[in-house]
């Protein structure tokens, strides 16, 4: 005894009974791509598998294209409004993502002018972003991509 100090602190507080309600509201207000149909253009098998898994895990339906030409053809053959967004790799064989985007934008159908097209590329320099915009892409995301950022971008562009 006689060594040290003892403190007694009393802090009155109320127990938050609405915490569950707020957590549910936060979940609802969180960005979602559930139910969206996304055209995924990617020539690398592993990258395709990862992106497809991520998108499906977030509740999206995915159609796959392995090069720019295939992407243009899938979009051309689709019903107007069938796809909600296109995730476009840039460096692909047969036709790159820039050329594919220009071709899609030039198609004579209303949704071709407005469908969100998002560049997915390892090149994240300002000039790459500018080139994507010039080709008609709405947004640019660097690989490897952050899932929450990708979902946020798709949600923002679609809604």
Cite the ranges covered by each PLM segment:
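C-terminal compact regulatory domains
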Residues: 1-159
